[in-house]
Amino acid sequence: MITVFVACLFQCVSSLPAKLYIKTTLAERIGKLQTVIGIDNDIVFAYERLYEDLTLLNHTVVGETLFDLTGSLEEGKNSTVDRFLGHVVIREFHRLHAGLQYVSLRNFSVSELVCFVNNNTQLSGSYVFLAGNTTYVQIDLFNENRGFVHDLINLSSFLQNRSLHVLSFYARRFCVEDILNFYGKVVFGDSRHRPPQVFSKRDTGLLVCTARRYRPIGTNIQWSIQNQTVSDDHMTDDFIRTEIAGQLLYSYERALSRALSMTQRNFSCEITHKLLVTPALLTREDAFSFKGFVNPVKQSEDMFPRHNFPAPHRKKFNKLQLLWIFTVIPIAAGCMFVYMLTRYILFFVSGGCSLNPNRVLKRRRRNDEVPMVIMEVEYCNYEADDYMELHSVQKVRDNSIAVVCGNNSFDIERQSKISRNF
């Protein structure tokens, strides 16, 4: 089993963050390919197929996907959401129609999901890819008839039943959220909850309303206090440059003056775009319901088997690492604790004595008043003639030395007794 994991953290450019995961597994011997696409740990698409012609595996790079976070507002486009499903869907199409001469992986290197707002302020989305190196095929994701601009390739046999509803789900969810970031009246007052478009700068305390990661062409932010428009004299503008995947984007911020930010309470922030004449037609419900697919996530779970899909940003430990973490390290720490505890118990039970003379010396120098013990061991054995241990040498206050007992001291004391007897 050869397993290839391709994982990418997809941060949506609107106020809706999303994590996009793609997991592709290839069983080479049986020719089984499984592709699972998930968002925020929910499976929205799982495709599994057995291939009789194993020679197709030699012409396919499994797990290679293209993620390119881009944004654009020129020429009527409100945003290019992402190039996230291009390789997955098209590679599946290539496997199903491998006998066609005009189908090749190289021909489908250009693909993107685009959101538009037409002159009637209606939201529309298309999936565009390049076929045959010269022809662009555009699929209308918001049209239930799903007409194609060019009928060179009949994609309905595959896309309509397998992947088209997934593409439509992504388009409607992200495109709507993306465009709504240019039209949203954010009202807040005494409530502690503050919407993500509004924040306070820590250094200055200014109240800021922002439209993040967009080109500022046609974008407008207007502050209001108690339904009264704030003049431009009390606001400051700021553009922040951000480069994502080679695409230069901006964040447009408009901050209230410090006096208004600190004294007023009832604020409202309105983000608009010049292309949206009647933006009320765009509602957030469009992101989760559309014709033919009431609940695309639920339908995907019913149509395709659900698989365990771990988040790729979480670190996975192998069995050896888990053995060290939960077995070896705790046992070693426990043994060290028992060893140290045993040493301390033996030390205090023995009356504070230690085999190290330096410790005894320091302790006795602090505690003894008259004699200062330099070294001591066991009690003296005066009865033994052949063996005598060195026991203690004491220094008295008058600088005289009292020899208690020991091999040398016993000899000295013994010699003195002999001399006195004579």
From Swiss-Prot:
Keywords carried by this UniProt record: Glycoprotein, Host endoplasmic reticulum, Host lysosome, Host membrane, Host-virus interaction, Inhibition of host innate immune response by virus, Membrane, Signal, Transmembrane, Transmembrane helix, Viral immunoevasion
Bilayer topology: Single-pass membrane protein
Keyword Glycoprotein belongs to the record: yes
Top-level taxon in the UniProt lineage: Viruses
InterPro entries linked: Ig-like_dom_sf, Ig-like_fold
Keyword Thylakoid: no
Any single Gene Ontology cellular-component annotation: host cell lysosomal membrane
Glycan-carrying positions: N58, N78, N107, N119, N133, N154, N161, N227, N266, N407
TM stretches of this protein: 322-342
Record localization: Host endoplasmic reticulum membrane; Host lysosome membrane
GO biological process: symbiont-mediated suppression of host innate immune response
Location (main, coarse): host cell
Endpoints of the signal sequence: 1-15
Cystine bridges: none
Job of this protein: Plays a role in the down-regulation of the host stress-induced NKG2D ligand UBPL1, which enables immune cells expressing the NKG2D receptor to recognize and annihilate infected cells prior to viral spread.
Descriptive protein name: Glycoprotein U20
Source organism (scientific name): Human herpesvirus 6A (strain Uganda-1102)
The encoding gene: U20
